[in-house]
Design a protein with these regions (language model features):
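Short histidine-centered catalytic/ligand-binding loop motif
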Residues: 23-31, 90-102
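Residue-level recognition of conserved beta-strand edge/terminus positions
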Residues: 1-2, 92, 126
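Non-catalytic substrate-recognition/targeting regions of SAM-dependent transferases
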Residues: 72-77, 81-83, 102-172
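Hydrophobic residues embedded in beta-strands of well-ordered beta-sheets
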Residues: 7, 89, 163-164
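Non-catalytic accessory regions of SAM-dependent methyltransferases
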Residues: 1-86
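Short, well-ordered alpha-helical segments
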Residues: 35, 39, 99, 103-107
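Short, glycine-/Ser/Thr-/acidic-enriched flexible segments
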Residues: 4-7, 96, 171
Length: 173
């Protein structure tokens, strides 16, 4: 709310960050429940498919097997970036709010992409950015849920016909 009582929006609180609130919605009727986040995930994915066409659908475009799925504030997920490499989603969480929502959002991501015919099997977290300390978050990396995860954190991905050896654990996110 503004000082005069005008509604401005609702967001995720971070008591340790210099950015105390990250706005998620300016709609006073929104509730940050599972249905809300499911709509956000679906919107972000459909936005990728609409704007990128088959490039957003690894496997449909033989020259590209990776894409960005969630781009933080641009998609309404403050502090969350998710990229797809082959059958793995690689997530980086940079805010307390998104950290708390991981158990809700990751399954929604897998469910949404699978419902669209995408072969995604696991989520690998790269939460090792030093900026997490400003939020009071620990540095960590690894499989979010090992069920469905490949035996190795190394993949070969293609982008525009070029192949790249990708080390999910140690390469730059």
């Amino acid at each position: 709310f503004e000082e005069n009582g005008t509604w401005q929006g609702a967001g995720l609180l971070s008591e340790r960050s210099k950015i105390r609130v990250r706005v998620v919605s300016r709609n006073a009727n929104d509730r940050f429940d599972k249905a809300f986040w499911a709509r956000r995930v679906e919107w972000a994915w459909q936005h990728r498919v609409t704007t990128m066409g088959t490039l957003a659908l690894p496997g449909c475009e033989p020259d590209t097997t990776c894409c960005r799925v969630i781009f933080s504030e641009a998609d309404g997920f403050p502090g969350l970036v998710v990229d797809r490499y082959e059958q793995v989603l690689v997530a980086q969480v940079g805010t307390v709010g998104m950290g708390r929502l991981r158990p809700l959002i990751y399954p929604l991501l897998l469910q949404t992409l699978r419902a669209d015919g995408q072969d995604v099997r696991a989520v690998y977290e790269r939460n090792d950015s030093p900026s997490r300390a400003k939020e009071g978050l620990p540095l960590e990396k690894g499989w979010w849920d090992a069920a469905g995860a490949p035996d190795s954190a190394r993949l070969v991905v293609r982008e525009n016909g070029l192949s790249f050896d990708l080390d999910l654990e140690n390469s730059q996110k």
